[in-house]
Amino acid sequence: MLNDTITHAERELYLTLLELAQQQPSAYEWLTRLPTWLNDIKDKANYAHAPAYQASVARLPNLTVNNVDLNSDVLTIEANLSESQRKQTMALLKQLMPWRKGPFQIGGQISSRQTVDTQDNSDTNAPILIDTEWHSDWKWQRVAPHLGNLKGRRVLDVGGGSGYHGWRMAGSGADTVIIIDPSCLFYHQFMAIRHFVGSADAHTYTHGTGRYRTHYIPVPLEALPEHSQLFDTVFSMGVLYHRQSPFEHLQQLKGQLVKGGELVLETLVIEGDANTVLVPHDRYAQMNNVYFLPSVAALIGWLEKAGFTEVRCVDVAVTSTEEQRKTEWMTYHSLADFLDPNDSSKTLEGYPAPLRATLIAKK
C-alpha cells in the first residue's frame, strides 16, 4: 500500500511534466513513459524489498514542521519530535538502511543544528541525524562554487542516489530538479525525506503554493527519451566510471541539455597525460563495475570529442576515509576496507586510491 507521500509526490511529478510539455513538446514522451517507470519500481517481482520499503515510508509519523533548510550542509527539517515519534521515526528510517548519501537531520532547531561529529542518537531528546556513508556535503562544497547560477533553471541529476544533491540544487534556486537513479532503495529513501520536507521546496506565488520543485524518477539515464533537450544543467556525479561505454554516456547527457546548457561531470580519474586511461582487470576498490578511469587530460579530450565546448577541470580531490566511511546508518564495508592496509595510496588490488575530478562543460 502506498501512502499519501509517494502518491502526492508522483502526482506533482506528473503535473510538472505536463506543464513542461506545454512549453517543450519533447516532454510528452516522458509523460507517456512515466506510468511504466513508476509502476516498475514498486513491482515485487522486480524488487523483492519494494513492499517493505513502501510500508516503512507509509508508517512515518506526520510531524509539525516549522522550517526546512535546503542550503545547509546537514539538510535540516526543523520539527518538534515527541519521544515516541522519535523512536518510531528512527526505527522506520533504519529499515531503509544503508543510507549512503547525505547527511540529513530531522527534528530540533535549525539554529542548534548538529554536526556529524557531535551527533548522539542515543539521546531521546536529540534530533535524528542520519549520518550517511558519504559526506555528500563535502562534494557539494567542492562543486557549488564553480556552477553557473542555478536560479530558475531546469536541472537533471543523473545517478542522484537518495537525493541529497538534488535537494541542494533546489536550495540553490533551481526551478525544477529531476533526480534519476534506478535504485529501489534510494527511491524510497528520497520519499522518506520528502515526507518530512513536504511542500517546503514548492514554488511560492502571491496566491499560494505551487508545484514541488524536486522530483525523482527511478530509472537509469538510458531509459530517458533521447535528445529531449529539456535541461539547462545536467549533473553526472559518480556515474561515468560505472559505464561500459563512456562516450555513449556523454552523448546521452548531451542529449538532455538545451543548446548552451551546462554539464557538471564528476568521476574517478588517475594521474597521467592525455593518453592515460586505467581499465581495471577485475575489481577496483572491490567494485566489479568500474570500467574506465581516465586522466583529467584524457577526460577533457573525451568531452571535446563528444562535442562539448569550454571544458574545464575545476576540482581534483583524493577521497579520504573521513569523507567515505562506515557509520551507524551504513554498517557495511566502506573505503577503509578497500585500501591497502599497508599503503593507503593504493587500493587492495594495487591500483591508485580513489581520486575524483569535477569538470564543467557547455553544449
Curated annotation (Swiss-Prot):
GO biological process terms on file: tRNA wobble uridine modification
EC number: 2.5.1.-
Binding-site positions, carboxy-S-adenosyl-L-methionine: K101, W134, K139, G159, D181, P182, S183, L221, E222, M237, Y241, R356
Catalytic reaction equation(s): carboxy-S-adenosyl-L-methionine + 5-hydroxyuridine(34) in tRNA = 5-carboxymethoxyuridine(34) in tRNA + S-adenosyl-L-homocysteine + H(+)
One GO molecular-function entry: methyltransferase activity
One Pfam short name: Methyltransf_9
Domain of life: Bacteria
InterPro entries for the chain: CmoB, Mo5U34_MeTrfas-like, SAM-dependent_MTases_sf
Name of the top EC class for this enzyme: transferase
Keywords from the named record: Transferase, tRNA processing
Annotated family: Belongs to the class I-like SAM-binding methyltransferase superfamily. CmoB family.
Self-association state and partner proteins as the record states: Homotetramer.
Protein's name in the database: tRNA U34 carboxymethyltransferase
Organism: Psychrobacter cryohalolentis (strain ATCC BAA-1226 / DSM 17306 / VKM B-2378 / K5)
Gene for this chain: cmoB
